[in-house]
């Protein structure tokens, strides 16, 4: 069954797509771009902590008067697309278990020929603190539970649940950062979390050559995270750096960066496990 009418509709036949951190910022922009590309019989799973913005996004993506979470065809941009919301705090064991259970329930359906998992959920940590201020193991462990553990656990769960299918394609995207490659003052947690995730997904690419793996650094985005960076970072030089990015209008609109990621996925020529930055493309 080939492509359907409409702009981009049906380009990706029967895809199971999962986006974490989908309620705002880059994740929301990406979900809005992906939905019209997902053809009949596709599933879009939106994962985030906050239920209300997720539900609002799901309603928008289905089209007004679209179906409930249990599927059926939507009215507008994505005919035949099921949208499921999973509200879960991925930093807690209970939330991670709930998210994993949803993936185990939804992904094994045999008609999906493609899996796309986008690990976008993440946080900055307390960037007012220097390295020497980070003495509380509970604070450190909770940061890595959300930013590293959940990405590893959900990715392995999703790949296991989807399984290996003849002729199918499986793609895993990690939303990375320049901070995975370069240290920044006061950002010990964020930089080490991003570096850890990049390496983790490089190992996945090595172990599973049939899975396409991409570490995509979206550039400095005009989001709430950037607002925190320029107001809360402990180091004055770093605060000034982020302030000047805003003042010189060098922050990137989320939709512009998300579109570059979609282009990368559609071209599908990246080396598996590669770190690709917005400015490389």
Language model features by range: what are they?
Residues 61-66, 75-94:
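Rossmann-fold cofactor-recognition segment
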Residues 21-24:
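Conserved glycine-rich cofactor-binding loop
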Residues 123-124, 133-144, 149-159, 163-209, ...:
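Catalytic loop of short-chain dehydrogenase/reductase
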Residues 64, 77-83, 102-119, 125-126:
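A glycine-rich helix->loop->beta "capping" turn
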Residues 98, 102-105, 115, 127-146:
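Active-site Tyr-X3-Lys motif and surrounding loop/helix of classical short-chain dehydrogenase/reductase
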Residues 39-57:
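Conserved glycine-rich Rossmann-like NAD(P)H-binding loop of the short-chain dehydrogenase/reductase
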Residues 211-219, 223, 231-281:
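C-terminal helical subdomain
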Residues 51-52, 87-102, 137:
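The beta1-alpha1 cofactor-binding region of Rossmann-like NAD(H)/NADP(H)-dependent oxidoreductases
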């Amino acid at each position: 069954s080939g492509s359907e009418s409409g702009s981009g509709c049906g380009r990706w036949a029967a895809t199971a797509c999962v986006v974490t951190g989908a309620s705002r910022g880059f994740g929301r922009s990406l979900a809005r771009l992906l939905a019209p590309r997902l053809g009949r019989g596709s599933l879009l799973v939106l994962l985030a902590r906050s239920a209300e913005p997720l539900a609002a996004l799901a309603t928008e993506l289905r089209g007004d008067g679209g179906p409930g979470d249990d599927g059926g065809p939507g009215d507008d941009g994505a005919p035949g697309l099921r949208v499921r919301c999973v509200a879960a705090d991925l930093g807690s064991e209970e939330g991670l278990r709930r998210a994993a259970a949803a993936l185990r329930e939804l992904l094994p359906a045999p008609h999906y020929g493609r899996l796309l998992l986008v690990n976008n959920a993440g946080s900055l940590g307390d960037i007012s603190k220097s390295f020497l201020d980070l003495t509380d193991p509970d604070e450190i462990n909770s940061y890595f539970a959300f930013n590293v553990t959940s990405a590893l656990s959900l990715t392995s769960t999703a790949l296991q649940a989807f399984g290996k299918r003849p002729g199918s394609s499986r793609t895993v995207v990690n939303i990375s950062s320049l901070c995975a490659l370069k240290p920044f003052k006061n950002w010990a947690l964020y930089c080490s979390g991003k570096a850890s995730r990049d390496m983790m997904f490089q190992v996945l690419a090595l172990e599973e050559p049939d899975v396409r793996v991409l570490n995509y650094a979206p550039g400095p985005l005009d989001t709430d995270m950037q607002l925190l960076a320029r107001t809360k970072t402990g180091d004055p030089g770093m605060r000034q750096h982020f302030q000047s990015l805003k003042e010189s209008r060098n922050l990137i609109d989320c939709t512009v960066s998300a579109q570059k990621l979609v282009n990368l996925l559609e071209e599908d020529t990246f080396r598996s496990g590669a770190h690709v930055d917005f400015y490389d493309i």
